[in-house]
From Swiss-Prot:
It catalyses: cytidine(32) in tRNA + S-sulfanyl-L-cysteinyl-[cysteine desulfurase] + AH2 + ATP = 2-thiocytidine(32) in tRNA + L-cysteinyl-[cysteine desulfurase] + A + AMP + diphosphate + H(+). The gene is ttcA. NCBIfam families: PRK10696.1. GO terms for molecular function: 4 iron, 4 sulfur cluster binding; ATP binding; magnesium ion binding; sulfurtransferase activity; tRNA binding. [4Fe-4S] cluster binds at C145, C148, C236. It is found in: Cytoplasm. InterPro entries: Rossmann-like_a/b/a_fold, TilS/TtcA_N, tRNA_Cyd_32_2_STrfase, tRNA_thiolation_TtcA_Ctu1. Its EC number is 2.8.1.-. PANTHER family: AMINOTRAN_5 DOMAIN-CONTAINING PROTEIN, SULFURTRANSFERASE-RELATED. One of its GO terms (biological process) is tRNA thio-modification. This is tRNA-cytidine(32) 2-sulfurtransferase. Its main location: cytoplasm. It comes from Rhizobium meliloti (strain 1021).
Length: 294
């Protein structure tokens, strides 16, 4: 799809209300249910993505995005929502979908190419056998996630540069952000999570997470209704006892006992009061000055 040229200021923010999500959707939504409940879900997710784009300035200076598509529910949903926003004129960037085939056993090599062709999105399928590297390097009994993620991210950065993209767009959602926060809190002794927007170490690509406000349950319902051809992860997904699963179970229990607390926790990550914490690098407790120490 050719995009109209626009000035940088024009792509920084687009004022949107619910009326913008009415009317004909992208053709890929022709398979979507016509139910009122699904329409509400679709509009809620579109609204949350647009809110994240605006809140974190994701459109600032952007022209071409590499969208990581793993074959899971989150990345499929992300791509569909971005394509719909683009179709409606609310996302003035070019999208390039990318799947990194990491050489996992029984990975169905035809599924993603066939699907991406069918929805008419520019895409690239890249093969890199990081599976063998992970199996060789990670000790028996240890989890693969960290090394697998680093190898995948490095390859996606490379592909993004080769494709002339200025951003790498990933499908992490609300629960991913909260789970990462509590993993750092309990095991790293620090307050940190996944940022919605991050400049990579080389300074040439921005990492974006437009699903930052989206609930995993909503994405699961959306993906099921859209009948995306889900590909399970036979590497990381086959491992039991991952620490992230413990955080997921803890958060699910909190939400069950106190509904709405996940949204409250997510809001808390955006309302940090440095003077009421214990980090002298963020607040000068010696002089009680709001300016951090040099």
């Amino acid at each position: 799809m050719e995009l109209a040229q626009s000035s940088p200021d024009e792509t920084d923010s687009v004022i949107v209300d619910d009326a913008a999500f009415e009317g004909a959707a992208h053709p890929l939504f022709s398979r979507m249910p016509s139910s009122v409940s699904f329409n509400k879900l679709r509009k809620r997710l579109l609204r949350q993505v647009r809110q994240a784009l605006d809140d974190f300035g994701m459109l600032k200076g952007s022209r071409r995005w590499l969208v990581g598509v793993s074959g899971g529910k989150d990345s499929y949903s992300l791509l569909a929502l971005l394509m719909d926003l683009q179709w409606r004129g609310l996302l003035p960037v070019e999208l390039v979908a990318c799947n990194l085939d990491q050489g996992q056993p029984n990975f169905p090599k035809h599924v993603l190419p066939d699907y991406l062709r069918s929805i008419g999105v520019k895409h690239r399928i890249e093969y890199r056998d990081t599976y063998s590297i992970v199996k060789e390097k990670v000790p028996a009994g240890a989890t693969y996630c960290s090394l697998c993620s680093r190898l995948r991210r490095g390859n996606l950065y490379r592909i993004g540069r080769e494709e002339g993209c200025d951003a790498l767009v990933l499908g992490h959602h609300r629960e991913d952000i909260l789970e990462t926060f509590f993993m750092n809190f309990f095991h790293g002794g620090r307050l940190a999570s996944m940022p919605a927007k991050l400049l990579n170490d080389e300074g040439d690509l921005t990492v974006l997470r437009p699903l930052a406000y989206a609930a995993e349950d909503d994405l699961a319902k959306f993906a099921a209704a859209m009948e995306f051809p889900i590909i399970p992860c036979d590497l990381c997904g086959s491992q039991d006892g991952l620490e992230r699963n413990a955080m997921k179970a803890m958060l699910a229990d909190i939400e069950r006992r106190m509904p709405g607390r996940k949204d409250t926790m997510l809001r808390a990550l955006g309302h940090v009061n440095a003077s009421h914490l214990l980090d002298p690098k963020l607040f000068d407790f010696q002089s009680l000055s709001p300016e951090p120490k040099e």
